[in-house]
């Protein structure tokens, strides 16, 4: 444990510029965003899919989270937030050395160019950790589009390449002082960098990987709705760090952002549920979680920049526009019907993220901008920004969409030359047991290799002996736990 000297102002661990409150909040916000991915989305993915894909889906999220960290500290962070190499990209470099990590951080967007340099009251290590959590969750969200059929080895190759070649470009352009930031495109906490990127890249990946089996597309019911709600709840609560950490300080802007985040999420959930009741005569728990998600995504581009009444307005749109694209437009579009986006990431993240960016361009107030932005004159169209700000929001979105579409395609086509992107149909029929040799629950009947009818087992009554030869054969075949023949 640390010695009492950690509390001494005369020691290097407590430099004059360190604000313990800001540092503590930023580390807390980092942890909250981390909890969104692991266990939040790990639990959500493992429960919202069919039982035979629970392990594979959870592992894809877990692997993306872990692999992102090493790539991030080796080269990714400085490509996204380091010195400028190109107007949309930073210079690669490690973020592993003491000399780099213990010094005072610099807000990435003010590190170069004509914008005054701003230094928060904590070390660079805190900033590296905070921004890692955003990079990781973007890949975890992207995974939702290709669950239930992507070759896990192809996914393992895809995650580092996409992080380096796609995510870092959006992050530098909008947050690292790149050309979109200097132009005045508003993205408070990741509506474009994270959600629009993951939605477009996920949809593109789903196209190239190919669809699930027909039987899985037709019937893909969640294996545990209660766990799905728990995972969604972790995601919602973690969003306090997601948007509350964006000002890089424990200040007024953080308070406004956290309140607006919760207001928009609740409004969107209620709006989505009402539409389900009106059109389908009953509320859907899955729909409620989707409505919660679209509300959280929609408020993200402007969480600390809009008034709370505007967060209600954004929640109404967040619960209705993605609902319409998913429930109505999707069924009328040949392209949307063809591409098998497993968890509808395109609708819940790309559509909601773009919607949030446009609404922020309308509703952002100059007074709230002045609390945290170093770019002068930014304001929504309703506050004097005019159509010009909407044009900037649409232009920024167009760049993010085009870059993710092209780069994701190139990465997957390159990987496909060496590793099949999709599992063979034989493995898709089986699921987790074929992909990992493991199952979420010890229940026979949904995707396992073992066929009880081929092994002379009693199906109940008094003739079966679990401790006899049948039980021994089950053990030899690798069955784990109590089995139920379905």
Curated annotation (Swiss-Prot):
The source's superkingdom equals: Eukaryota
Q: Which UniProt keywords apply?
A: Ammonia transport, Cell membrane, Membrane, Transmembrane, Transmembrane helix, Transport
GO BP annotations listed: ammonium transmembrane transport
One Pfam family cited in the UniProt record for this chain: Ammonium_transp
Q: In which tissues is it expressed?
A: Expressed in roots and leaf blades and sheaths.
Q: How does it sit in the membrane?
A: Multi-pass membrane protein
One of the record's GO cellular component terms: plasma membrane
Q: Which InterPro entries does this UniProt record tie to the protein?
A: Ammonium/urea_transptr, Ammonium_transpt, Ammonium_transpt_CS, NH4_transpt_AmtB-like_dom, RhesusRHD
Q: Where is the composition biased (Basic and acidic residues)?
A: 454-470
Where found? Answer: Cell membrane
Q: Where are the transmembrane segments?
A: 29-49, 57-77, 127-147, 161-181, 190-210, 225-245, 252-272, 285-305, 309-329, 343-363, 399-419
Please report what switches on or represses expression of this protein: Not induced by ammonium supply in roots.
Q: Where is region (Disordered) located?
A: 454-473
Q: A single GO molecular function, which one? A: ammonium channel activity
Tell me the protein family, please.
Answer: Belongs to the ammonia transporter channel (TC 1.A.11.2) family.
Q: Which PANTHER family match?
A: AMMONIUM TRANSPORTER 2 MEMBER 1 (PTHR43029:SF41), AMMONIUM TRANSPORTER MEP2 (PTHR43029)
Described function: Involved in ammonium transport.
Q: Under what name is this protein listed?
A: Ammonium transporter 2 member 1
Source species, please?
Answer: Oryza sativa subsp. japonica
Q: Which gene encodes it?
A: AMT2-1
């Amino acid at each position: 444990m640390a010695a009492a000297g950690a509390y001494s102002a005369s020691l290097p661990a407590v430099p004059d510029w360190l604000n313990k409150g800001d540092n503590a909040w930023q580390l807390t916000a980092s942890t909250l965003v981390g909890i969104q991915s692991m266990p939040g989305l790990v639990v959500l993915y493992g429960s919202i899919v069919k039982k035979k894909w629970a392990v594979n889906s959870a592992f894809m999220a877990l692997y993306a989270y872990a692999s992102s960290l090493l790539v991030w500290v080796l080269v990714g962070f400085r490509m996204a937030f380091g010195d400028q190499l190109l107007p949309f990209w930073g210079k690669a470099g490690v973020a592993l050395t003491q000399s780099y990590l213990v010094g005072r951080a610099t807000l990435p967007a003010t590190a170069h160019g004509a914008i005054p340099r701003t230094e928060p009251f904590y070390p660079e290590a805190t900033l590296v950790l905070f921004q890692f959590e955003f990079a990781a969750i973007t890949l975890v969200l992207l995974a939702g589009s290709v669950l239930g059929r992507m070759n896990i080895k192809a996914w393992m190759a895809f995650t580092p390449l996409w992080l380096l070649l796609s995510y870092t470009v959006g992050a530098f352009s909008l947050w690292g002082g790149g050309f979109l930031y200097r132009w005045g495109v508003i993205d408070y906490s990741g509506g474009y960098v994270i959600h629009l990127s993951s939605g477009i890249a996920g949809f593109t990946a789903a196209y190239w990987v190919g669809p699930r089996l027909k039987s899985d597309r037709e019937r893909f019911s969640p294996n545990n709705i209660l766990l799905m709600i728990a995972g969604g709840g972790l995601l919602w609560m973690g969003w306090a760090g997601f948007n509350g950490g964006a000002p890089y300080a424990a200040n007024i802007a953080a308070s406004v952002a956290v309140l607006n985040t919760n207001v928009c999420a609740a409004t969107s959930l209620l709006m989505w549920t009402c539409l389900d009741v009106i059109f389908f005569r009953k509320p859907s728990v899955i729909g409620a979680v989707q409505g919660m998600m679209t509300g959280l995504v929609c408020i993200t581009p402007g969480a600390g920049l809009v008034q709370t009444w505007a967060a209600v307005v954004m929640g109404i749109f967040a619960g209705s526009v993605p609902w319409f694209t998913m429930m109505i437009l999707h069924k009328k579009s040949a392209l949307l019907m063809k591409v098998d986006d497993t968890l509808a990431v395109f609708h819940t993240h790309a559509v909601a993220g773009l919607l949030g960016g446009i609404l922020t361009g309308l509703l952002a107030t100059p007074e709230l901008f002045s609390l945290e932005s170093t770019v002068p004159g930014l304001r929504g169209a309703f506050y004097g920004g005019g159509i010009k700000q909407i044009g900037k929001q649409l232009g920024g979105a167009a760049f993010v969409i085009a870059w993710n579409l092209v780069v994701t395609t190139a990465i997957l086509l390159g990987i496909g030359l060496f590793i099949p992107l999709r599992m063979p149909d034989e493995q898709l029929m089986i699921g987790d047991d074929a992909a990992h040799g493991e199952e979420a629950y010890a229940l026979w009947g949904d995707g396992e290799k073992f066929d009880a009818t081929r092994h002379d087992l009693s199906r109940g009554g008094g003739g079966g002996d679990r401790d006899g030869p049948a039980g021994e054969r089950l053990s030899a075949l690798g069955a784990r736990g109590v089995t139920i023949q379905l």
